[in-house]
A protein has these predicted regions:
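Conserved catalytic cores of phosphodiester-cleaving nucleases, focusing on short active-site segments
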Residues: 50, 74-76, 82-90
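Active-site metal-binding core of divalent-cation-utilizing nuclease and nuclease-like domains
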Residues: 62-81
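Short low-complexity stretches enriched in small and charged residues
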Residues: 31-44, 92-101, 172-189, 195
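Interdomain/boundary linker segments immediately adjacent to catalytic/signaling cores
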Residues: 1-54, 58, 63, 69
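Non-catalytic C-terminal interaction segments of nucleic acid-processing enzymes
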Residues: 147-209
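Short coil-to-beta-strand transition motifs
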Residues: 80-82, 134-135
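Catalytic cores of nucleic-acid endonucleases
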Residues: 89-149
């Protein structure tokens, strides 16, 4: 074992000694850690979910640090021929509100990259931004666990997500950029669905036009 491996091994040993109680306490106190932990948990649960779908195979998980080339958390083949990409995002805990008038929950989903990177827009312009482009992925998936205590996901087409209104970008740029936040309600509004097969078929039909 070389010196680098010895140091790395010490870090793993520290992790092994952390108790479940400590993890729970720290996670509840730290919103950023909570977001990271729940985000990865949502990814793993989604992976298990699509493994059960016999129409889906060749599931791929991309490097989290390679967002220049890969904009989705998972992609897979549907019916052996349609490559579908899914971006998983979680509800922001502190954004959850109860709408008494309409008897529903309101919340915000953070729908952007973790750090700025240079992107090229369809009109040829290059900008540095955390915003996703329209079409960077096919489907936005959001776990509904905070509302129903079950690992059920809400799905929305990328093309139907809110576009950016940020004044820093010109009108010609904004039409190619998604907003960094997406509103969600529970029960779900029109545009969202819990049926993955249904929304995949919408993607396939759109791509076949």
């Amino acid at each position: 074992m070389n010196k680098e491996e010895i140091v790395k091994n010490k870090i793993y040993k520290i992790i092994d000694k952390i108790s479940i109680g400590e993890i729970r306490k720290i996670t509840k106190k730290c919103p950023s850690l909570r977001g990271i932990l729940l985000g990865y948990l949502a990814e793993e649960r989604f992976h298990k979910l699509i493994l059960k779908n016999k129409k889906i195979n060749d599931i791929r998980k991309h490097d989290d640090h390679d967002r220049k080339n890969n904009k989705a958390d998972r992609d897979f083949l549907y019916k052996q021929k349609h490559r579908i990409s899914v971006q998983l995002k979680s509800v922001q805990t502190n954004s959850i509100k109860w709408d008494e008038k309409n008897k529903r929950f309101l919340a915000t989903v953070q729908n952007d990259a973790s750090c700025k990177r240079e992107i090229t827009l369809p009109n040829g312009e290059k900008i540095r931004t955390t915003n996703y482009k329209v079409g960077d992925y096919d489907i936005l998936a959001v776990p509904l666990y905070p509302f129903c205590s079950k690992w059920i996901y809400a799905y929305k087409l990328n093309k139907n997500c809110k576009k950016s209104t940020y004044k820093k970008y010109s009108e010609s740029q904004r039409k190619y950029l998604l907003s960094t936040t997406e509103k969600i309600t529970y029960p779900l509004e029109k545009g969202w669905t819990t049926n993955l097969d249904t929304i995949i078929k919408e993607v396939v039909n759109e791509n076949n036009k």
